[in-house]
């Protein structure tokens, strides 16, 4: 019976405190105890009209008690006390679920990465696998799964609500933690059910000498009797269980043959050691423990940041893999479509060769076909060259960005070393000297006003301060008054600078909003282009189908009306010519779009170069400032 303060389900005040020494020190416990570590704190009486039960709902002398895990008609919804929106807790739950599935032989491949954001199909498969341990004949229903799963969890006694809408998007960041909590609860239920099946809960008589203490049977029986007695009194309204605690402690000591004298001597020795530790702590001048705790908190914070960054990288990697898979599927579909067009062209060529034309007509058609093929081949080469050029420009742009980010990181590291970063640093004076990876058009102007000019002003102020302090050494009293006056002036300057920083932050936020609107605009244009592409493909397929129908009609009437067949064949040739003309126009439009993208990349490259030059200038300025500061 483990009472964990970090997972209390009741929102009422605690009735007991942990001031009493745990019985773990008095009994030789095993680590694999099915009921957890024994901890019976000294109860402290408090008045409470409404108490919470974990197993049901009853009415006692103290008033009505509510059940946390299932009720007999209550309709109020409970709030989940687990930190399901904490990334560290969610990762821990995912790891537990992964280990459980692997240990129990989950069919199919499962990874921790797949459990970060599973699909609805994977969730249903995991749920069915875990539920089969409770009911081996269970089969997942085929209809209205989003209604059946919350109902089954409620029937099992799951105390928290799982909405039907969350079942439609089970892998979303706001719904997956709730579903994960339900799976963890179901997994714990399976473990508890399996533990109860492995051991016999119908205990024999306590005085039976054939009991095996190695199997913990007698100890588990004592635990169950103690829980039953205390729970009955609790449901009757009692808040203290001193008699039950004493009786339980006596039986445990009798069961394990505890030496009272040895226990008493160990307690006295523990008290003496605690007094000695307190005396040493009072006598010590520096508390190294506080420093170590501070360092531990700092390291834990850094570890959490690294874990968050790793999760972000994994999510980015997953997105790139999904995008690559989508592009591969799209490429395969285009290749299949191209193969179909080639077969159709071969069939039409065969039909065309079997038809009766004059040598002049055949020569003219072949000449036009060769010209169109050469045009298409040239345009295809131009398109490939344009795509390769765009790819090279993107690679160069990414390399330039990486170099700029390295220099920015070096600058920020130097600023932290000089205590200029962050905003609350010792030498920042209310300025934000940190450079962030932002490539907007107003970034350079903002950094000049926010970083370069304040740094120059700080250098001038440092030089003036050094000269002033050299002269101030002549008179100590005048120095004190002058320093006080300067402090007052600096406070006013800091207030003004903070106001300026607030205005600059507001301008930055407006610029970010404009960038977001620009991104939405580009996304809308991209959707429009995709729609145009689909419409064009639909028209092409429709034209091909019409051509096929016309060819079939011409074959049926070939021997009846030769002249009419020739006319329809000419119409087919005309339609194919129009189709090739539309294709050529589309290729010209694609080439024009590639040229526009190249111009845009050139502009971005120039902006990055300007940013790199400004960063080099700021780096030189900071190095000069360091040299002057060191010379002081």
Curated annotation (Swiss-Prot):
GO terms for molecular function: kinetochore adaptor activity; microtubule binding. Residues 263-419, 459-632 form a coiled coil. It is found in: Nucleus; Chromosome, Centromere, Kinetochore. GO terms for biological process: attachment of mitotic spindle microtubules to kinetochore; cell division; chromosome segregation; metaphase chromosome alignment; mitotic sister chromatid biorientation; mitotic spindle organization; positive regulation of mitotic cell cycle spindle assembly checkpoint. Keywords: Cell cycle, Cell division, Centromere, Chromosome, Coiled coil, Kinetochore, Mitosis, Nucleus. Its main location: nucleus. GO terms for cellular component: kinetochore; Ndc80 complex; nucleus. Gene3D superfamilies: 6.10.250.1950, Ncd80 complex, Ncd80 subunit. The keyword Transit peptide does not apply. PANTHER family: KINETOCHORE PROTEIN NDC80, KINETOCHORE PROTEIN NDC80 HOMOLOG. Acts as a component of the essential kinetochore-associated NDC80 complex, which is required for chromosome segregation and spindle checkpoint activity. Required for kinetochore integrity and the organization of stable microtubule binding sites in the outer plate of the kinetochore. The NDC80 complex synergistically enhances the affinity of the SKA1 complex for microtubules and may allow the NDC80 complex to track depolymerizing microtubules. May play a role in chromosome congression and may be essential for the end-on attachment of the kinetochores to spindle microtubules. Belongs to the NDC80/HEC1 family. Component of the NDC80 complex, which is composed of ndc80, cdca1, spbc24 and spbc25. This is Kinetochore protein NDC80 homolog.
């Amino acid at each position: 019976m483990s009472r964990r303060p970090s997972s209390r389900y009741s929102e009422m005040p605690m009735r007991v405190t942990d001031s009493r020494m745990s019985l773990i020190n008095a009994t030789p416990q095993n680590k694999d105890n099915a009921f957890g570590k024994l901890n019976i704190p000294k109860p402290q009486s408090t008045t409470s009209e409404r108490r919470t039960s974990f197993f049901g709902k009853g009415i006692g002398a103290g008033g009505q008690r509510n059940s946390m895990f299932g009720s007999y008609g209550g309709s109020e919804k409970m709030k989940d006390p687990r930190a399901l929106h904490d990334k560290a807790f969610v990762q821990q739950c995912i790891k537990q679920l992964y280990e459980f599935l692997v240990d129990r032989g989950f069919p199919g491949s499962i990874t921790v990465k797949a459990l970060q954001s599973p699909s609805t199909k994977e969730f249903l498969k995991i749920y069915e696998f875990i539920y089969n341990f409770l009911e081996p004949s269970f089969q997942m229903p085929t209809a209205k799964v989003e209604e059946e799963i919350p109902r089954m969890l409620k029937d099992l006694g799951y105390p928290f609500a799982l909405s039907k809408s969350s079942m439609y998007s089970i892998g979303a960041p706001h719904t997956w933690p709730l579903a994960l909590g339900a799976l963890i609860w179901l997994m714990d239920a399976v473990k508890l059910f399996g533990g109860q099946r492995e051991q016999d809960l119908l205990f024999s008589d306590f005085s039976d000498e054939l009991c095996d203490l190695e199997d913990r049977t007698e100890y588990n029986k004592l635990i169950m009797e103690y829980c039953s007695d205390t729970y009955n009194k609790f449901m009757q309204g009692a808040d203290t269980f001193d008699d039950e605690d004493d009786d339980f402690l006596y039986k445990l000591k009798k069961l394990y043959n505890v030496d009272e004298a040895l226990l008493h001597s160990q307690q006295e020795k523990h008290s003496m050691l605690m007094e000695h530790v307190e005396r040493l702590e009072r006598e010590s001048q520096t508390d190294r423990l506080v420093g170590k705790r501070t360092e531990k908190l700092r390291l834990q914070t850094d570890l959490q940041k690294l874990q968050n960054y790793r999760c972000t990288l994994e999510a980015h990697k997953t997105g790139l893999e999904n995008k690559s898979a989508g592009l591969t599927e799209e490429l395969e579909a285009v290749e299949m479509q191209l193969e179909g067009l080639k077969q159709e062209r071969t069939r039409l060529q065969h039909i065309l060769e079997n038809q009766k034309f004059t040598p002049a007509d055949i020569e003219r058609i072949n000449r036009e076909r060769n010209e169109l093929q050469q045009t298409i081949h040239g345009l295809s080469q131009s398109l490939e060259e344009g795509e390769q050029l765009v790819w090279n420009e993107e690679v160069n742009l990414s390399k330039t960005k990486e170099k700029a980010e390295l220099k920015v990181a070096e600058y920020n590291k130097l600023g932290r070393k000089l205590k200029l970063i962050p905003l609350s640093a010792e030498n920042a004076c209310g300025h934000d000297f940190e450079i962030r990876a932002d490539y907007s058009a107003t970034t350079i102007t903002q950094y000049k006003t926010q970083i370069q000019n304040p740094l120059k002003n700080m250098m001038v102020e440092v030089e003036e301060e050094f000269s002033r302090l050299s002269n101030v050494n002549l008179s100590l009293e005048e120095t004190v008054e002058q320093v006080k006056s300067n402090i007052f002036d600096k406070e006013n300057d800091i207030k003004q600078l903070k106001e300026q920083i607030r205005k600059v932050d507001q301008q930055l936020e407006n610029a970010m909003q404009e960038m977001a609107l620009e991104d939405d605009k580009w996304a809308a244009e991209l959707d429009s282009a995709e729609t145009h592409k689909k419409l064009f493909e639909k028209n092409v397929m429709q034209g091909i189908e019409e051509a096929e129908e016309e060819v079939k009609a011409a074959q049926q009437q070939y021997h009846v009306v030769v002249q009419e067949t020739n006319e329809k064949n000419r119409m087919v040739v005309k339609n194919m010519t129009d189709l090739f003309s539309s294709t050529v126009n589309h290729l010209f439009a694609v080439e024009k779009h590639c040229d526009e993208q190249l111009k845009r990349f050139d502009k971005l490259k120039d902006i990055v170069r300007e940013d790199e030059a400004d960063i080099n200038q700021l780096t030189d300025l900071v190095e000069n400032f360091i040299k002057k500061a060191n010379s002081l």
